[in-house]
Amino acid sequence: MGRKKIQIQRITDERNRQVTFTKRKFGLMKKAYELSVLCDCEIALIIFNHSNKLFQYASTDMDKVLLKYTEYNEPHESRTNADIIETLRKKGFNGCDSPEPDGEDSLEQSPLLEDKYRRASEELDGLFRRYGSSVPAPNFAMPVTVPVSNQSSMQFSNPSSSLVTPSLVTSSLTDPRLLSPQQPALQRNSVSPGLPQRPASAGAMLGRDLNSANGACPNPVGNGYVSARASPGLLPVANGNGLNKVIPAKSPPPPTHNTQLGAPSRKPDLRVITSQGGKGLMHHLNNAQRLGVSQSTHSLTTPVVSVATPSLLSQGLPFSSMPTAYNTDYQLPSAELSSLPAFSSPAGLALGNVTAWQQPQQPQQPQPPQPPQSQPQPPQPQPQQPPQQQPHLVPVSLSNLIPGSPLPHVGAALTVTTHPHISIKSEPVSPSRERSPAPPPPAVFPAARPEPGEGLSSPAGGSYETGDRDDGRGDFGPTLGLLRPAPEPEAEGSAVKRMRLDTWTLK
């Protein structure tokens, strides 16, 4: 970009004239300095402005230069304005146009120099247009979370298909030439049993693989439970590749079945995933209602689930809110739970009401239920049991526990494999504070294998269940079976257990 061209004529504006004088005076003195240094000469510059104000410049001493000037009588070159204008016209320059110098540089700019600069600028522009597109863009990876709603219901017919309604699809906006580690993706299910996926964060989407069957990865949580703190809406529970169940927070679920078990050779995983999206889950319920039960004869081998999440009470879910001082990493080593008829009833298999008595070496015969008015009996001594075996608290959660859902296959039984020196008992709970029908007395059965036709009915509510939910209709009972062990290592006698049962019942 060249300098601004001005006409070489008197400037009428006082302010512009003063500015131009200051700039060009400094430029003239700068040129005189350069000339005196470069060419080893003496220069004396005397300037009077339009108001007769003196400005002078001397390379050495003004008096000495003026003395030499007055005493010099040799012929010399002397020029005026007319001589300069004539010289410029001979060289092809227009004497009427001159570039406006700045305060730092008063170098005269010729048209040849301008053409040179213009050609250089055009060449640079051509290079940018030619090679600008091949400049590699900066490589970056940006995880983008996109909610996806799958309208197809064919995914539930494949055992290895994952739940994507609603799901979080994590894509990376990255350069194809970039080989950077991808961010951990938020996925619903783990398709590979040996490589379970882990969630990237614990914000709006909490997911964890409770994969105790293959032992590929340990449980990262110390007490073994998955928090559901960011789930004000629905809580889907997924077992294995497709064993999915959706539990609404404050209303009874519709009579739907979405039971999809993996292959028999693969032990299914039990996963608890919470999400804040509710529309996609309602669409998932509609798809599951049309599908029905496809494969319900497979067995759930080793589920691991926790019922000690404190924030589930505020959601109104029928889970037990036991303190986390207990061992909450519960396992059911071999529980063939596929189709119990008692699971289909609304009040079947409630929390903490299944009483299983097992002596150290032999199972005890079934006993009739004790009335609440019976007197406590004195305790009887019983052989102590080794304290090194830690019993486990076993809650069982299946997708066919949804109330009001019929089961096509009946005949499987509940098998609880325990150590021969472990006594498993169940502590009863107080009567329900919700609107529910009159509860029948709890049934007592041995821990070996009950008959398929026997139902495990109990009251629909409990002391570990919240009683101030918004919708407490009686047809929505708990859907977890809970086997509670003795907290102390020394076992008690049957009379002491009956006394404790009566004491809890009277409360």
From Swiss-Prot:
Compositionally biased region (Polar residues): 180-192
InterPro entries per record: HJURP_C, MEF2-like_N, TF_MADSbox, TF_MADSbox_sf
Keyword Acetylation included in the entry's annotation: yes
Disulphide linkage map: none
Main location: nucleus
Domain MADS-box: 3-57
The protein's name in its UniProt record: Myocyte-specific enhancer factor 2D
PANTHER family, sorted: MADS BOX PROTEIN (PTHR11945), MYOCYTE-SPECIFIC ENHANCER FACTOR 2D (PTHR11945:SF23)
Function: Transcriptional activator which binds specifically to the MEF2 element, 5'-YTA[AT](4)TAR-3', found in numerous muscle-specific, growth factor- and stress-induced genes. Mediates cellular functions not only in skeletal and cardiac muscle development, but also in neuronal differentiation and survival. Plays diverse roles in the control of cell growth, survival and apoptosis via p38 MAPK signaling in muscle-specific and/or growth factor-related transcription. Plays a critical role in the regulation of neuronal apoptosis.
The organism's taxonomic lineage, starting at the top: Eukaryota, Metazoa, Chordata, Craniata, Vertebrata
SUPFAM superfamilies recorded: SRF-like
Domain of life: Eukaryota
